[in-house]
From Swiss-Prot:
One of its GO terms (cellular component) is plasma membrane. This is 4-hydroxybenzoate solanesyltransferase. Disulfide bonds: none annotated. It comes from the Bacteria. It comes from Synechocystis sp. (strain ATCC 27184 / PCC 6803 / Kazusa). The keyword Repeat does not apply. Catalyzes the prenylation of para-hydroxybenzoate (PHB) with an all-trans polyprenyl group. Mediates the second step in the final reaction sequence of plastoquinone-9 (PQ-9) biosynthesis, which is the condensation of the polyisoprenoid side chain with PHB, generating the first membrane-bound Q intermediate 4-hydroxy-3-solanesylbenzoate. It is found in: Cell inner membrane.
Length: 292
């Protein structure tokens, strides 16, 4: 363990920083697809114990993903302005502590998974290698955000099967919506680090699409809309769902217009990430009310 100086935050707070639990937007944006799935599968509000299990599971899993990412990137993050103060990058925590925190998060997620259906449990097991592989994908795969999006999609599969015990056509449509949505907002997020990523030599979708990155984000959001439109049709949801989808479409169109500006403000990328949390909750409300 790295020695704490008088000016350092306490150990427990440094671990919170490592898990990124002090940044709720990143935790919520993983929780949202899981909540979409559990509410649609339950055709309304699911049992509160199950809802709590899913929420805590996504919190543990997102924390695990953040720690694993920082362990992979501990020698890269100090070279990036946005990430250089992360605990492992700043050497505020040792690698051994990081591994220990990751194992605790994994054990917590596994313990919660035992309360789910057998299919959900095995989907949780299948998700772990994808979560662990994502940081490595940045070194060898030109669009690592696709790996992250597939990892995000497991939240849909796990949560839906936790309610029904199986997967349906609607599950896979929602999975597709989640994958495309994640590709969209995480590509925007990666745009903030383009110059650092290019200098260091790691891959990102923002670099891969180059000057057409705004158009790529627009296509990802359009595909998300297509999946959500089809989902509403096959589940025969009521007009309240369609209202929420219309609001989401307006939000995504505005974001696309902002990204199409010749020189977007750097702060725009983080703002769009946060706006997608709001859009996700608007859609969640529509999915809940869509069964009335």
């Amino acid at each position: 363990m790295v020695a704490q100086t008088p000016s350092s935050p306490p150990l427990w707070l440094t671990i919170i920083y490592l898990l990124r639990w002090h940044k709720p937007a990143g935790r919520l944006i993983l929780m949202i697809p899981a909540l979409w799935a559990v509410c649609l599968a339950a055709q309304g509000l699911p049992p509160l114990p199950l809802l709590g299990t899913i929420a805590l599971g996504t919190l543990a899993t997102s924390g695990l993903g953040c720690v694993v990412n920082d362990l992979w990137d501990r020698d890269i993050d100090p070279q990036v302005e946005r990430t250089k103060q992360r605990p492992l990058a700043a050497r505020a925590l040792s690698v051994q502590v990081g591994i220990g925190v990751a194992l605790v998060a994994l054990l917590c997620a596994a313990g919660l998974a035992f309360y789910l259906t057998p299919l959900s449990f095995w989907l949780c097991v299948a998700a772990v290698p994808v979560i662990v592989a994502y940081p490595g994908a940045k070194r060898v795969f030109p669009v690592p955000q696709l790996v992250l999006s597939i990892a995000w999609g497991f939240a849909v599969l796990i949560s839906w099967s936790a309610v029904t015990g199986d997967l349906t056509d609607a599950t896979w449509v929602l999975w597709g919506a989640t994958v495309f949505w994640t590709l969209g907002f995480d590509t925007v997020y990666a745009m903030a680090d383009r110059e650092d990523d290019r200098r260091i030599g790691v891959n990102s979708s923002a670099l891969f699409f180059g000057q057409y990155v705004g158009e790529a984000v627009g296509i990802f959001f359009a595909l998300t809309i297509g999946c959500l439109f089809y989902l509403g049709m096959i589940l025969m949801l009521n007009p309240l769902y369609w209202l929420s989808l219309a609001i989401a479409i307006v939000g995504w169109v505005i974001q696309y217009i902002q990204l199409s500006a010749p020189t977007p403000e750097p702060k725009l990328y983080g703002q769009i990430f946060g706006q997608n949390v709001i859009i996700g909750f608007v859609l969640l409300a529509g999915m809940l009310l869509g069964w009335l």
